[in-house]
């Protein structure tokens, strides 16, 4: 078995029970070694899709990922020089191991190797741990994870201020696992006297049974995700969510967990940050049957894949979603896996490296999607001056955030300009045009301009973003945004509202 698999051992606990349910014999084997495929593909690099990703567990298929339309991948480690065929995005992962000595953990890569990896992957999205809630994976208590995250967050940010650092990657967004994350937030605040910083959150979205296997490992229901380490000795948590095999590909459960986690983010002060679904799929092999006697055939797996793709592409929420991505609930997602034939959902044959029926379905789904760029100003604001003037002009700093909610990994260019008044009705430009270059999936850039000699009054300040020549914007109705700015001459006293972080109750 391959060490980087995120859910290997806890599912293997189920195998005896599952064979009885299926009424047959499952042959489980590790993917054999195979020839590496060339780092080439037949797809235009401008066509790969940033939302669609893959968990690559065998390096020989990475060169073929763009042919699926996939725009990013992760491989449960952090490589210094990862393959990036056609400019595909790579998300490195810091892996942890519990340690009996202080600080309670070790991690890989570390030291010089980690510094070199950070330097070679500027601006990367760093996933800090893989399933820290799993007794079979990184297996950290909440206190230890908080300590480990603090070290890695500041280490990565110090080496590369443009890096994005992302916590989480729990197996599934169930109540016991959200309680585990609550304990992490509380522990972080207690240890470091500040809320846990994050540039986004990552989760996995399997639908697995939760039973405390430390209590009775022989219990037939002891399969799936188990219970996080913090709760294994807690009699109140003998069970979490209990499911059957027939439930493991139910779309409504999948959707509920996305909604639940987005609500959790909002309630904990992370509203609107990106959400990355960094692993999901159908784990049970094709010859297993659920409680209704239905096997996990390629057709069944493909149906689940298509339904989840449909949902994540379309799901938005103006309160919970990411404002930099037209309020979408999920920014990027990753299917398990390329070649791990121990489990279902395999996209490539591990020997021939040719697409399977599931891989063909993935490629067919992405092939018919429109390739889109969608630039828009997310916000317009002003600062740098006193809101009260004695009648003299002030100098204001105008700010905006420009986002691209399109679906392409390849970055696109646009020009941005501020105006006093509507640009379509004779508005006067403020400062020079500024350029941005952004990938899709909610990538954004903040811009500012100095506006000198502004007399007292009320102003409608506009920001307009214009795609570069040759780039078609999918939605031209959102290329302009407006903000009201007031330079006053009279006092109005208003109460001050402060937002404080309160650790969640246990």
Where are the model-predicted features located?
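Hydrophobic faces of well-ordered beta-strands that scaffold small-molecule active sites
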Residues: 52-54, 73-75, 90-94, 126-128, ...
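Boundary/entry segment of secreted carbohydrate-active catalytic domains
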Residues: 38-79, 94
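Short helix-terminating capping/connector loops at secondary-structure junctions
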Residues: 47-48, 160-162, 194-197, 269-273, ...
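Active-site regions of enzymes building and remodeling cell-envelope glycoconjugates
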Residues: 70-74, 84-98, 104-109
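Active-site cleft segment of glycoside hydrolase catalytic domains centered on the general acid/base Glu
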Residues: 58-61, 66, 100-258, 267-272, ...
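Sec-dependent, cleavable N-terminal signal peptides
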Residues: 1-37
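Extracellular/luminal regions of secreted and cell-surface proteins that mediate adhesion/ECM remodeling
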Residues: 368-506
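Aromatic-rich peripheral "rim/lid" segments of glycoside hydrolase catalytic domains that contact
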Residues: 89-93, 102, 291-300, 304, ...
